[in-house]
């Protein structure tokens, strides 16, 4: 670290929805010559993932209360006090010029101590319904940013920071116009798999006449791939040219860009990535998401005719098959264009600029 080098501390943890957008901003700031240090939980996924990106870490132990037992609730005051003390120690060691909170339980004690120590705090909320931590910290932050309009009062709509390759794909009009033959459908279950999609999609395809069936790439997660194969076999399909079953996808930008339609859950980053690429989507929100935020995430696109939202309780093979029969590449291309128009492809740069400005830095450093 040079005497003139500025430092950003990113605090985020718990889930990829918090960590990955934080990494996008971290790399953008590093490219502009900033030093970046990450504050996270040693037991969280960030402790494994972030060091692989060459970013040093500070650790604070703190967990949430949702779904926890009486013992956790009774020990909360002690655990919170300890986490605040650990956070203060990290802030004193790192001496950041600005702190960016991307969400997760760890953000609360660290965010409070950032504000009390007089350092500028920038918050970013990825979901359409803000979590409790960000609702509280928004009152202490210098700048509050949101991925979806209205998630927090008096916030700036920047969108979600995403990987650069997703923000620079070919426009949907050109992609869709160059294709012929059956529709290309991408089904994304994520690393955890999505049992409802894994069960319903094969049965829906079986209800379609051979000439109506799309080409399908179905991703289900390593732990669920064998069950998925069994579901397709039970529906009368053998994996082949028109049905590819994969445990994971290395290049999501290419997978999204090759699809006419994506069938998936509606986590914040998934919705943002689909809009950035510009691809039609049928969202089936995870029904047990906190505050049902996946429904409102999906509604942001669905209400504009840029996607279709089907609740899991309403999803059936018959409904999906009927809906697919009514789609054409032209109708899906229109949906994709609407989706692309709602994207914020410059979100990573915008969040980085806000952080720089909060630290009193020259924004030209991020051009």
Curated annotation (Swiss-Prot):
- GO CC annotation: what is one? plasma membrane
Residues binding UDP-N-acetyl-alpha-D-glucosamine are: 15-17, 127, 163, 191, 249, 294
Q: Which organism is it from?
A: Burkholderia cenocepacia (strain ATCC BAA-245 / DSM 16553 / LMG 16656 / NCTC 13227 / J2315 / CF5610) (Burkholderia cepacia (strain J2315))
Q: What is the lineage of its organism?
A: Bacteria, Pseudomonadati, Pseudomonadota, Betaproteobacteria, Burkholderiales
Q: EC class of this enzyme?
A: transferase
Q: What is this protein called?
A: UDP-N-acetylglucosamine--N-acetylmuramyl-(pentapeptide) pyrophosphoryl-undecaprenol N-acetylglucosamine transferase
Q: Which NCBIfam families match?
A: murG (TIGR01133)
- How the protein sits in the membrane? Peripheral membrane protein
List, alphabetically, the Pfam families matched. Answer: Glyco_tran_28_C (PF04101), Glyco_transf_28 (PF03033)
EC number from the UniProt entry: 2.4.1.227
Q: Which reaction does it catalyse?
A: di-trans,octa-cis-undecaprenyl diphospho-N-acetyl-alpha-D-muramoyl-L-alanyl-D-glutamyl-meso-2,6-diaminopimeloyl-D-alanyl-D-alanine + UDP-N-acetyl-alpha-D-glucosamine = di-trans,octa-cis-undecaprenyl diphospho-[N-acetyl-alpha-D-glucosaminyl-(1->4)]-N-acetyl-alpha-D-muramoyl-L-alanyl-D-glutamyl-meso-2,6-diaminopimeloyl-D-alanyl-D-alanine + UDP + H(+)
UniProt entry keywords in alphabetical sequence: Cell cycle, Cell division, Cell inner membrane, Cell membrane, Cell shape, Cell wall biogenesis/degradation, Glycosyltransferase, Membrane, Peptidoglycan synthesis, Transferase
The molecular function GO annotations come to:
UDP-N-acetyl-D-glucosamine:N-acetylmuramoyl-L-alanyl-D-glutamyl-meso-2,6-diaminopimelyl-D-alanyl-D-alanine-diphosphoundecaprenol 4-beta-N-acetylglucosaminlytransferase activity; undecaprenyldiphospho-muramoylpentapeptide beta-N-acetylglucosaminyltransferase activity
> Which InterPro entries does the entry link to?
GlcNAc_MurG, Glyco_trans_28_C, GlycoTrans_28_N
UniProt-annotated location(s): Cell inner membrane
Q: Which GO terms describe its biological process?
A: carbohydrate metabolic process; cell division; cell wall organization; lipid glycosylation; peptidoglycan biosynthetic process; regulation of cell shape
Q: What does this protein do?
A: Cell wall formation. Catalyzes the transfer of a GlcNAc subunit on undecaprenyl-pyrophosphoryl-MurNAc-pentapeptide (lipid intermediate I) to form undecaprenyl-pyrophosphoryl-MurNAc-(pentapeptide)GlcNAc (lipid intermediate II).
The record, for CDD domains, names: GT28_MurG
């Amino acid at each position: 670290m040079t005497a003139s080098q500025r430092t950003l501390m990113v605090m985020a943890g718990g889930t990829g929805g918090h960590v990955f957008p934080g990494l996008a901003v971290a790399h953008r700031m590093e490219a502009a010559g900033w030093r970046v240090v990450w504050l996270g939980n040693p037991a969280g996924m960030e402790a494994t993932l972030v060091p692989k990106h060459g970013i040093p870490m500070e650790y604070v132990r703190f967990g949430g209360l949702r779904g926890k037992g009486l013992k956790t609730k009774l020990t909360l005051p002690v655990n919170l006090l300890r986490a605040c003390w650990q956070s203060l120690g990290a802030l004193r060691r790192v001496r950041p010029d600005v702190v960016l909170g991307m969400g997760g339980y760890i953000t609360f004690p660290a965010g409070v101590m950032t504000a009390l120590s007089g350092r500028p705090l920038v918050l970013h909320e990825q979901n359409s319904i803000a979590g409790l931590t960000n609702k509280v910290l928004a009152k202490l932050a210098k700048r509050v940013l949101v991925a979806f309009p209205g998630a927090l009062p008096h916030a700036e709509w920047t969108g979600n920071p995403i990987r650069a390759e997703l923000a620079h794909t070919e426009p949907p009009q050109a992609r869709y116009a160059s294709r012929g033959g059956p529709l290309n459908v991408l089904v994304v279950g994520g690393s955890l798999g999505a049992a409802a999609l894994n069960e319903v999609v094969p049965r829906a395809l079986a209800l379609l006449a051979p000439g109506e069936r799309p080409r399908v790439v179905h991703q289900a997660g390593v732990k669920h791939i064998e069950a998925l194969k069994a579901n397709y076999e039970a529906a009368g399909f053998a994996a082949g040219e028109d049905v590819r079953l994969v445990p994971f996808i290395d290049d999501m930008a290419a997978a999204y860009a090759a699809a006419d339609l994506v069938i998936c859950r509606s986590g914040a980053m998934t919705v943002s990535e689909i809009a950035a690429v510009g691809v039609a989507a049928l969202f089936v929100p995870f029904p047990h998401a906190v505050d049902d935020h996946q429904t409102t995430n999906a509604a942001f696109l669905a209400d504009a005719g840029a996607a279709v939202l089907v609740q899991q309780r309403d999803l059936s093979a018959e409904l999906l098959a009927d809906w697919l029969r009514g789609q054409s590449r032209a109708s899906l291309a229109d949906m994709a264009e609407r989706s692309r128009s709602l994207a914020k492809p410059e979100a990573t740069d915008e969040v980085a600029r806000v952080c720089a400005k909060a630290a009193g830095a020259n924004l030209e450093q991020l051009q």
